Amino acid sequence: MAGNGKDKEVDKSPSVSTLKLLGKRLFNSSSHTDNSSLLLSAEQLGNGRSLRKRPTSPSISGSGSGGNSPSSSAGARQRSASLHRRKNNASVGFSNGSVSSHKSSVALQDLIKHNNNPYLNSPSDILGTGTGIASTRDRDRAVLDREKEKERARNKERNTHHAGLPQRSNSMASHHFPNENIVYNPYGISPNHARPDTAFADTLNTNKENDLSFYMHDGNSKIRMLPLPIANPNDFLPEDMKQYSVHLTDNFVFDTDNKPIGSGGSSEVRKVKSSYRQKDVYALKKLNMIYHESPEKFYKRCSKEFIIAKHLSHNVHITNTFYLLKVPTTTYTTRGWGFIMELGVKDLFQLMERTGWKNVPFNEKYCLFKQVAQGIKFCHDNGIAHRDLKPENVLISKEGICKLTDFGISDWYHVIPHDYTSPVKTCQGMIGSPPYTPPEVMYFDAKKHYPEKFQKPYNPLAMDSYALGIMLITMINNIIPFIDSCNTDARFREFEVSYDNFINHQNPHFRDKGCHKPGPGSEYSLARNFKNTDATRIAWRLADPNPATRYTMDDLFNDPFFQQIETCVEPNDDDLVRVPELRKSTSTNDFSENSLDAPHDQEVIHTSNPFLKKETLTSKPRSMLEIAESPSLKQKSKVKDSAKTKTHDVGDEGGNESTKPKQQDKKENLKKDEVKNGDKDKVIEEATTTNVDSILEKPTPTSTKVEDNLSEDDSTMKELKSMLNSTPTTPTHNGPTPLPAKAGTQLDKRMSDLSLKSETPASTKNFSAPNVSSSSNSLRSLGSPSVSSSKKKKVIHHHLDITNSVTNMSSVSAFISR
C-alpha cells in the first residue's frame, strides 16, 4: 500500500492547516460575530469545500450528508473507530457562543473552575466571542468579591491601627492586571508568603508553617511585635530603679541550648548567661503584647509588673527580679522588653505531678505550704495583692525554697499606693486561674452568663486566701478538687453542700472569728486524706465560699496549728543570689557609651538593690586636660600592697623620673631595700588585723559582750596593733616570723577576754551553741546575722528529691531543660 498514489494523497492531508485556519477565524472575528457565519464556516470545512484535495476524508458535518466518496471505497485504508469518534466529536456547532457537546461543556467548565489563570478577571474578553465563559468568570468574581468584603469586615473588628491598610488578595485569580506593571517581589506571589509587618505578626497567613514569616518571629503567628523604635525602660521607671544599662546584649548572652523553659499567653522564659561569668545563669522573661494592646499600654503594663516584682525582691520567698532590658530581634526571640530574673529549678506543680508526691510526708507538704503563705503575707504587708496564686507560679530554688513569681496581674490593694492607712481598693472583672479563682470572681466570667446582680466588687486579699486554701487541698489530695469554683461545677456544688452540712450539724461556730475547734473529718471527701482535723480547719477556712467569713492572712498566722508547722527556712533569712553585673552600657540617653567612663564627677558603683546606698569612689583619676591645666598640682596617695608600700607622687608619673639626680635614685634604692625587709612584718600585721576584724563582725554566742567591750573601750584594736608593732623582728626564710613573748602573751590574754576564735571552714566548724541549720539551705543560713543561741534547730527537708517513675510526661515537656 506504500506504492499507491492515492495513499500519498492521504498522507498529505491538510488537517493541521484546517485547524490553524479555524483558529485564525475565531480570534480575528469581532466580539459579537454572527453565529450563522461560524456555522457556515464549519459546514464549509466539514464538506471539504475549503480543502484542496481530500477525496478520502469523511464528512464532519452534523447533517450526515456527504458520506465517503467512491474513490475512498476503492483502495482507502480502514479508519479506526477511535479516529471516527474523535473526528465526529470535532463537529462543532456554535450556538449562543457555547459548546454544543454536553460532555465537552462539562469538561470545559470543570477546567475553568480549577484553573488558576491570572487573566481570568481581566476586563477585556481575551477569548473574544465566548459569553458562556464570561458568565462563569463573573460568577467566580462575585464570590471572590464577597469573600474580600468579609475579610475587610473582620479586619475592622480587630480594631488595630493598621486595619485600614489595603488587604492583599487571597489568590492570583482574584487579582486584576489591567494597567499594572509586573514588579519583582522578594517575598513571592503566594498568599501564604505574606510580607512581614513591622507592628503585628498576627495578620500573617498561617496556612503553611514554613512561610517566610516563620523566620521573622518565634514561629507563632499570633505573637504581636512592637513597632520600632523600642522605648527606653528608664523612661517608665522611678528614679530609684533607673538602670545603668538597658540593652540585653550589653551584658548577657543567650544559652547555647536555645530551648524555652516556660511560656504563657503574655511571656516566654529562656535562659541567659552573664557575659562575664558563664556559670551565672539567669532567666529572661520575654514579654509579649496581648489581645488588642497598644504599645503604650504594653510599656505601662510591663513597667508596673517590674516595679512590683523589684519592690518585693528583698525577701527569701520572692523570686529576685534584677533588670528590665530591651530585647533585640534574634534567632531566639523577637524584639521587645524582658526581665532578668532568678532562675528556678522547678515549680511546685512539677513536684505535685510526680508519682512520688503521694508518698511525701505531711510535714514536708505543710512546710511548702507555709513557705508560700509567708510569701503571700510578705506581699500583703507591702501593700500588694498577687491575684494569680497557683502552683505554677511558685518556683523552687536549688536550696528547696519556695519563691513566688509572675506578678503580671498583681496590684496595690490600697486606694492610695504605699499609703497603708488608706482603705482597701476593691476589684471588678474576671482575673486569675480557675479553680484557684474564688466564686465571687467567677461571677464575672462571660462564659458562665451570670446576671449582673451577682457581679459585685470583691476584695483582692480574699482572692489570695482562697487560692492558698485550694492549693493546700490539692497538695494533700494529689488532685484538683474541682475545675471551676462556681455552681456550674458539680464537684464544687458538692463542696458547698458539705461545707453547709458541717456547720449545720457538727460545728455551728466554725466560721466565727477566733474559733479554733477541729475541722471536718474523714466523712467528707475533701477532708479524708488530711488525717488531721486541725489541718482541715485551715484548708476549709481558707477555701470558704463566703468571702466575708473567709480566713485572712492574719487569721491564718494566728491559728495554733499553722504556728506549729516547722519549716526548713525562715522568712528573715538572707537569700544569697549573685546579682548580675552591668559593666557595659550602649545607651546614649542617660549614660555614657563608654562603660569605663562614669556618668557623673564621681564614679558610681551601680547596684540592682534600690534600698542600698550608692557607693562612690573617694578618688578619681585625673584626666589629661586637668594635668595640662595644673601640672604643678601633686596629689599624694598611699598604695597598699603586699609587695609595694612606698609613697609616690601622682604628678611625677608623666616622665619626670628620668630627670631626677642620681643621688636621689640611690637614696630611693636604699629606702626600697629597707621596705623589703619590713614587708613580711607588715603583711602579718595586716593579716592579723583583718582576721580580728572579720572575727569581731561574725556572730558568736558572746557577740553581745564583744560589742559592749568595743563600745566601752574604743582603743582595743589600737592596742592590738601597737603590741604587734612594738618589737619588729627581721623575717627569716626558714619559717614564720615569731612574735615577741610579751606581745604574744598580751595578745593571747586579750583574745581570750574577747572570746575570739580562729576562723575555720564551715564544714569543720564546731559551734558551742546548738546546730543552727542542717537543711538543704544550710550554706545560706550559716553565718547569718539572724542566728542566735536561742534559735531552735531547723528541720531537714529534701523537697527536690521526690521520685518520679514517669520519665517523659506530656505536661512537663516544656520544662525538661530546667
From Swiss-Prot:
Biased composition (Polar residues): 28-39, 585-595, 755-767
GO molecular function, one term: protein serine kinase activity
Major localisation: nucleus
SMART domains (alphabetical): S_TKc (SM00220)
Active site: 388
Biased composition, class Low complexity, residue ranges: 57-81, 727-736, 768-789
Catalytic reaction annotation: L-seryl-[protein] + ATP = O-phospho-L-seryl-[protein] + ADP + H(+); L-threonyl-[protein] + ATP = O-phospho-L-threonyl-[protein] + ADP + H(+)
InterPro entries named in the record: Kinase-like_dom_sf, Prot_kinase_dom, Protein_kinase_ATP_BS, Ser/Thr_kinase_AS
Bias type Basic and acidic residues, positions: 136-160, 638-651, 659-685
Residue ranges annotated for the Protein kinase domain, each copy included: 255-562
Residues found modified as Phosphoserine: 59, 80, 623, 632, 694, 711, 752, 755, 778, 781
Region (Disordered): 28-100, 117-177, 585-795
One GO biological process term: putrescine transport
Taxonomy, superkingdom: Eukaryota
Gene Ontology CC terms: cytoplasm; nucleus; plasma membrane
Described function: Essential determinant for high-affinity spermidine transport. Required for the activation of the plasma membrane proton pump PMA1 via phosphorylation of 'Ser-899'.
Additional notes on this entry: Present with 1420 molecules/cell in log phase SD medium.
Family: Belongs to the protein kinase superfamily. Ser/Thr protein kinase family.
The protein, known as: Serine/threonine-protein kinase PTK2/STK2
Species name: Saccharomyces cerevisiae (strain ATCC 204508 / S288c) (Baker's yeast)
